[in-house]
Amino acid sequence: MFQDNPLLAQLKQQLHTQTPRVEGVVKGTEKGFGFLEVDGQKSYFIPPPQMKKVMHGDRIIATLHTDKDREIAEPETLVEPFLSRFVGRVQRKDDRLSIVPDHPLLRDAIQCRPVRELTHSFQNGDWAVAEMCRHPLKGDRAFQADLTAFITNGEDHFVPWWVTLARHNLEREAPAMVESALNDAELEREDLTALNFVTIDSASTEDMDDALFVQDNGDGSWLLTIAIADPTAYVVENSELDLTARKRAFTNYLPGFNIPMLPRDLSDNLCSLRPNERRPVLVCRVTITEEGTLSNDIRFSAAWVESKAKLVYDDVSDWLEGNNRWQPQDTAIAEQITLLKRICDARSNWRQQHALVFKDRPDYRFLLGEKGEVLDIIVEHRRIANRIVEECMIAANVCAALALREHLGFGIYNVHTGFDPALVEQAASVLKANGVGADPQALLTLPGFCELRRHLDALPTQFLDSRIRRFQTFAEISTVPGPHFGLGLEAYATWTSPIRKYGDMVNHRLLKAIITGQQAEKPQEEITVQLAERRRLNRMAERDVGDWLYARYLQPQAGTDTRFTAEIIDITRGGLRVRLLDNGAVAFIPAPFIHAVRDEVVCSQETGTVQIKGETVYSQSDKIEVRIAEVRMETRNVIARPVA
C-alpha cells in the first residue's frame, strides 16, 4: 500500500537531501576499520561492516551519521576506485580462485577468474595481473577481479623483477631485431678512424655510446672531440624499430640486468663503440680554454671512428691516482688519459665558479647470485675517471643545446626552473630562520639560485639544503630551450646516450638536419609526455626491485646487534626515514622507537627536527647509529631502531 505513496516518496527524498554528505579518500587500517579523509584536514570513522563495501584508496561520497557522539561515514557512491589494474598473488581453494593485491594496506583476498583468452591453470602462490570488474558501491554483491595475465609462479627466484615490471606494465625483454641496413646516404661522413679515440665505462658495459679524443693546441687550450654512437643511421624515423624505441623511451636499468630500448644487436653490437671496430658516429668538436670556457667554435659533423681502447673507470682512476696495478696499453692512450684529466679539472673549476656541480654521492650495486640472491652490495664512489666522462658529456650537451637553440629554436631540452614561484616566499622564510638572507625574487633567477646553492654547499651540514628541496620544482623535458637551474646552465640538451634514450635520438636527427642544411620539424609535445612518464615508471621499477632485494638482504640482520650508520633523509609525523650508508637501503624508524612516551616526542616535517620535551634530539641530514628491528617481507619495509 506504501509503494506508490507520493507523500512517502517525498519524505524519502527530503531525508536523502537533508543527510549531510562528504567526498574523500578511504584510508584502511590493519584492524578492519577505516577513515574517510576529506581534503587532508578532517577524517571520519568508517566501521568494519561499512569498510567491506570499499577499499583503501577508493575516492567515495559518504553520508554522515552520528553514533554515540561520534560522526560516522557510511559509503554511498564510488567516485574513483583505487584499484583498476593491479598485481597480486593467487590463492586456490577447492577450485575457487582469489587474489590478494600486492599492496601494504590491501590484505583481503578478492574473488577472481581468468579471462577466456588466458589458458594458464593458476595454482596457489602464482603471481598474476588482474583488473577489477565488480565493486559493492557499483551495485555488485562483492568485489571481483578478472585475471588478465600470468606473471610467474611463487617459487621463481626472479619474482622481484617480473612482478615489478608487470606492476608498471613495462617490457620484460629486449625488442626483436628487424633487418636494418645503414641508411644515411645523404650524410657525408669524415674518416676519423686514425685518431686515438677511447671509451671509458664500467667493465661490464656493452652498450658503449661515447668515445673521446683530445688534441693539445700548444697554447694552453685543447680541442675536445666527442664521438657519439649513431643508431639513427640504422633506425629510420617512424619505422617499426623507431616506434618501439619511442614507446620504451629509455633502456630500463634494474639491479642485475637491463632491458634495452633498442634490440641488443644494435645497442650492444652494431652501434656500440667497441674497440678496433669502425663505427658511424655524430661528432662534436669544441675548443676548451685553460680556464675551462667552451669557445664559440662548436662544430657538429658525421664521421667514422674506431675506438683504440675500452678503458674501465677503476683502472683509469687507479692509474691517475698513482696506483700502478694497471697501465695504459701504449703512450698514445696514456697521453689521452692525461689530457682528459686536464680538461676535467679545467671544466670542473669553471662550473664551480660559473655554474653548479653536484655533490658526489656513491652508487650502490647489487652483486647477485644465479638465483637472484643478493651476495653483496658494493659501494661505488665516484672517482676521477667518472668525473672525466661526466665533464665531457656535460660539455657536449651544452654544445648541443646552444647549436639547437641557435639554428632551430627547438629540440629535446632538459629544463629545471629552480624554486616553485608559489613556494619561494616559504623557502626564503626557512632560509632567514636559519641565518641565510635571501630575496625571493632573486631566488627565481639563475644567478640568484646559483649563489644560494654555492652558499649551501659550503655549509658544514646538509640540513638547510635538505630543508628547502621541497620548495623546488622537478626537472622537466621541453621542446623549447630553457634554463637548467640544477646544473646552473642557461640551456641543456642531451644527445650523448642515443642507444639508451629516445630523446637523444630525436636530438641526433635534429643535429643531422643542421649538418646537412635540411628542414627540421619541431618534436611533438606528446614525445615529451611519453619520455617523462617512462622515466617516472623506470625509476619506480628500479626502486621497487631495490626495496625487495634490500628486504631479502637485511632480513637476517633483523633483531640482531649489528649496527649501521644511517643518514636521516626525511622526518614525518610518524617517525624518521633513514638511508643506511653502507648499502643504500632506506629504513623507517617509528616515533615510539625514539621515545617511549608518545606525547613527549614531536617529529616535525616543517622544522626538519625531532624534539623530546622541547629539546631537539635529531635533525634532517644527521648521521645516527641504528639496528634493524624488523623486516616485513610482504611489504618490503625495513624497520630500524636508534642505538641508545
From Swiss-Prot:
Localization of this protein: Cytoplasm
BP-aspect Gene Ontology terms: mRNA catabolic process
Keyword Magnesium: no
Pfam families: OB_RNB, RNB, S1
Family note: Belongs to the RNR ribonuclease family. RNase II subfamily.
InterPro entries named in the record: CSD, NA-bd_OB-fold, RNase_B_OB_dom, RNase_II, RNase_II/R, RNase_II/R_CS, RNase_II/RNase_R, RNR_Ribonuclease
Entry protein name: Exoribonuclease 2
GO cellular component, one term: cytosol
SUPFAM superfamilies per record: Nucleic acid-binding proteins
